[in-house]
A protein has these predicted regions:
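Structural detector of well-ordered beta-strand residues that form the stable sheet scaffold
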Residues: 4, 67-70, 90-92, 130, ...
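Phosphate-binding beta-alpha-beta segment of Rossmann-like dinucleotide-binding domains, i.e.
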Residues: 87, 94-143, 155-158, 162, ...
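Rossmann-like adenosine-cofactor binding region
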Residues: 54-58, 172-241
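Structural signature of beta-strand start/N-cap positions in the alpha/beta core
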Residues: 2, 24, 90, 143-145, ...
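Glycine-rich Rossmann-fold phosphate-binding loop(s) that bind the pyrophosphate
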Residues: 149-150
Length: 241
């Protein structure tokens, strides 16, 4: 099998293929769209990250020998999964690859926001002492709303509980009577918007989650609510924010 790699993979990742002599790997980083169209049928599989878009236009030209699209990442929003499925092409991703990293980054952003860390750092770097300008908020006892309790959402919820926050969550694929093995209240989406002091989003980008955070949902939220999005950008309507 010949595999095309169009985006950056670590040396360790590429070395995994060396164990299989029947696999030939061709790394072509930053392959532009027209070049991809001209060479893609020389391979039976492609591995991408975020830069390469495997949309219906590309997938439609794939011949019958093409077997697999692999994305080295969590989401597959840059792959037209429906078009691939119609041609019998397998689409794979790595849903747990960056779960811990993303959960930790979410909490890092949370502390930065409530403690005004970037602003205070910039002030100190400018050789100023403006201590009273950067008073923060205490997180203990605050209501922390998680939208999406998948691999990442659960890890974030665990960390929020460790800080002493009350955690509420919504996930349409988890029933309210599910035992989560942690003290998280499963509630309707509207309750998350209304009750949370902090809202964090951990969903894929789909037609159902695009602009999930927009004018309608924002109007339900508390004044001064903190919104953290470590998922896909399209989930939050930035103009409405």
């Amino acid at each position: 099998m010949k595999i095309l790699v169009t985006d950056g993979l670590s040396k360790e990742g590429l070395e995994l293929f060396a164990k299989y002599p029947e696999i030939e790997v061709d790394v072509r980083k930053k392959t532009d769209r027209e070049e991809l169209k001209s060479i893609i049928n020389n391979y039976q599989a492609v591995i991408i990250r975020s830069a390469t878009k495997m949309d219906s236009e590309i997938i439609d030209i794939l011949d019958d020998n093409f077997k697999l699209i692999g994305r080295a990442g969590i989401g597959v929003d840059n792959v037209d999964v429906s078009a691939a499925s119609k041609k019998g092409i397998i689409v794979m991703n790595t849903p747990s690859a960056n779960a811990i990293t993303t959960a930790e980054h979410t909490i890092a952003l949370l502390f930065s926001l409530v403690r005004n860390i970037p602003q205070a750092f910039a002030s100190m770097k400018a050789k100023k002492w403006e201590r009273s300008s950067f008073q923060g908020k205490e997180l203990y006892g605050k209501t922390f709303g998680v939208i999406g309790l998948g691999n990442i959402g659960r890890l974030v919820a665990e960390r929020a509980l460790g800080i002493g926050m009350k955690v509420i969550a919504h996930d349409p694929f988890i029933s309210k009577d599910t035992n989560l093995n942690m003290p998280v209240d499963l509630v309707d989406m509207e309750e998350v918007f209304k009750d949370a002091d902090i809202i964090t989003v951990h969903t894929p980008l789909t037609s159902g989650t695009k602009n999930l955070i927009s004018k309608g949902s924002i109007n339900l939220m508390k004044d001064g609510v903190i919104i953290i999005n470590c998922a896909r950008g399209g989930i939050v309507n930035e103009e409405d924010i």
